């Protein structure tokens, strides 16, 4: 007994594990698989963990998840789904400026609060005009004013119930013959708050609620569908107008200024300067240009992997930094160009520097599972950008196909020859637009179907919350505070430890995550 008994009770606890500073000052470049976080003390449930985190200096998300601006990951469908679940999507720019701006517009109009620029028709318009508007915009609850414009007198409204059973030969009828007349409408006065208007709409059991001024002129409208979205998606990321947040990628060339203008006109909330190596005079000049022309527009710079790179972009005025070079599953930059940095080291080093200036960091690349997300956030990142993890979800662009009985979607790096051949923007990202010989920095592949974002992202959220619970932190802010104070401890993993930490010693198994 004397061999292992020590007097004095349990007041003595030996120092265990490494601080983040000790872990990353060893001189080795570390990936997310090279270390683990040591557990802490639990006195709360996982669903109490607050995942609120900063995307930029002025934009805060309730979920620290961001979809990558890749043409096989984020267009309007993905951006809408990400915003509804508390994150944000960045529309790719491997397309025409007009297409990209229209995708942003779709996101901004998906949920609107007070709609101040609705589709409006006049009594002399015809039924076929309603069907055309429905085909173009996806709805047919349209207010009718005497001139067919906003700001003129409200005379009625057309809903699906008014036109559902009309025969084709009736499509030339005037709307004044079939619309619901003004005297039968429920309206709200101008100056009403959104909360009051929603309550009126709820009581009325109508699909739309027109807002009129003292002269009975239409000034806005709200939709019942938005009430349902508010109920179903309480974490949704919204701007001051109650529209969904949406980001977009642009390049750093002169013609990207035209793209920027269209995006700003469409209502984009934040732009990311999409470059494989962000520490360039081209990006610095573009940051300054955007800040001068659109001072309220948030700008994310990158990509960077060192404090020296980050310094130049912070000095130029960025509102956040995107960190990662060559760590993505489809990226071969490190292999081909011998430049880059292991992602865990890059995230820690840049985050530790950028926090001194209040600049949030987005960890971009190398995310293979929810554990990697938790590790990136514990190393100082405020949000995590995902490509392959979200590819092949229902909301990702592209069609499913089958190979050996497995349902797949195409996924490619923006530095792949495939993407470069599609549009010049991909070449600009890798400074290759003038090269006669293209050097691919990415590959094309396929990813297995993951189902809908509306099921997959809640799984990721729950995983992050459980990770924070095991750490003993009730919020991501507390996780980062524990890391910087040295309270949060880490441990390096040998290759054998990594094998031990995975599934092993089984003849066969099925791995279902959610």
UniProtKB/Swiss-Prot annotation:
It is found in: Cytoplasm; Nucleus; Cytoplasm, Cytosol. Changing residue 333 to I: In mycophenolic acid resistant cells. Acetylated by CLOCK in a circadian manner. Ubiquitinated leading to its degradation by the proteasome. The active site is at residues 331, 429. GO terms for biological process: 'de novo' XMP biosynthetic process; cellular response to interleukin-4; circadian rhythm; GMP biosynthetic process; GMP salvage; GTP biosynthetic process; lymphocyte proliferation; purine nucleotide biosynthetic process. Residues 114-173, 179-237 form the CBS domain. The modification N6-acetyllysine is found at residue 511. GO terms for cellular component: cytoplasm; cytosol; nucleus. IMP binds at residues 329, 364-366, 387-388, 411-415, 441. The keyword Secreted does not apply. The keyword Cell inner membrane does not apply. One of its GO terms (molecular function) is nucleotide binding. NAD(+) binds at residues 274-276, 324-326. Keywords: Acetylation, CBS domain, Cytoplasm, DNA-binding, GMP biosynthesis, Isopeptide bond, Metal-binding, NAD, Nucleus, Oxidoreductase, Phosphoprotein, Potassium, Purine biosynthesis, Repeat, RNA-binding, Ubl conjugation. Pathway: Purine metabolism; XMP biosynthesis via de novo pathway; XMP from IMP: step 1/1. It is an enzyme of class 1 (oxidoreductase). The modification Phosphotyrosine is found at residue 400. HAMAP family: IMPDH (MF_01964). NCBIfam families: IMP_dehydrog. This is Inosine-5'-monophosphate dehydrogenase 2. It comes from Mus musculus. The gene is Impdh2.
